[in-house]
């Protein structure tokens, strides 16, 4: 009986694996200069965050609706040790942009929690005192549309009337080596 059970279980496993549909291939990472995908994100519930992005109402928004010339999107995960380590530096960058009268309002920052629920994003925001909006992407739909990059990863989107264009892409190492962090946000505006 044990032998029959193992044989039956093995056949069911093979049958099950053959019936599982293969998913679509992962999206290629975005390239500099290409259009930013027309993805929608949930409008933040917090009034300050909504105001910071220049949004009103509730529901969803497109990146091109953000009231800025450029949007720096940080793809992070609550469980990423590099994201945790660098959170204070990204916060410094946010503060430097907000202190600079030439950059405030022109460059905004938005975090995208890859694989994180609203609860996890909230814990990350509270733990690391993140001053800019963070949006959960629990099912990784947005992360996949953006090329399934590692975390942390940054996408600078130039916002214009024709839609958003990718201005630059970089991991935290480049952000640090390029001298953008901490305290020199003017380099972002030249990207």
Language-model segments: residues:
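Bacterial N-terminal signal peptides
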Residues: 9-20
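Bacterial N-terminal signal peptides that target proteins for export
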Residues: 1-11
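Boundary at the C-terminal end of the N-terminal hydrophobic targeting segment
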Residues: 23-27
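Conserved segment of the thioredoxin-like fold in thiol-based oxidoreductases
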Residues: 99-138
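A short beta-strand-turn-helix
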Residues: 41-71
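Thiol/disulfide oxidoreductase modules built on the thioredoxin-like
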Residues: 126-130, 138-191
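Conserved redox-active cysteine motifs that mediate thiol-disulfide chemistry
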Residues: 75-92
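Short pre-active-site segment immediately N-terminal to redox-active cysteine/selenocysteine motifs
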Residues: 69-71, 76-79, 150
């Amino acid at each position: 009986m044990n032998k029959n059970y193992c044989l039956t279980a093995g056949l069911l496993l093979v049958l099950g694996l053959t019936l599982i549909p293969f998913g679509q291939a992962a999206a290629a990472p975005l390239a500099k200069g290409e259009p930013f995908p027309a993805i929608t994100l949930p409008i933040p519930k917090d009034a300050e965050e909504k105001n910071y992005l220049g949004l009103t109402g509730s529901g969803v928004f497109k990146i091109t609706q953000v009231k800025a010339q450029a949007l720096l999107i940080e793809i992070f995960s609550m469980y990423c040790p590099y994201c945790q380590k660098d959170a204070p530096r990204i916060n410094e960058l946010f503060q430097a942009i907000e202190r600079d009268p030439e950059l405030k309002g022109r460059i905004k920052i938005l975090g995208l929690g890859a694989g994180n629920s609203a609860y996890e994003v909230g814990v990350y925001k509270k733990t690391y005192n993140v001053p800019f909006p963070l949006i959960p992407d629990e099912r990784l739909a947005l992360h996949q549309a953006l090329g399934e990059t590692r975390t942390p990863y940054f996408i600078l989107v130039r916002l214009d009337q024709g839609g958003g264009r990718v201005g630059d892409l970089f991991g935290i190492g480049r952000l640090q080596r390029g001298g953008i962090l901490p305290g020199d946000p003017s380099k972002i505006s030249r990207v």
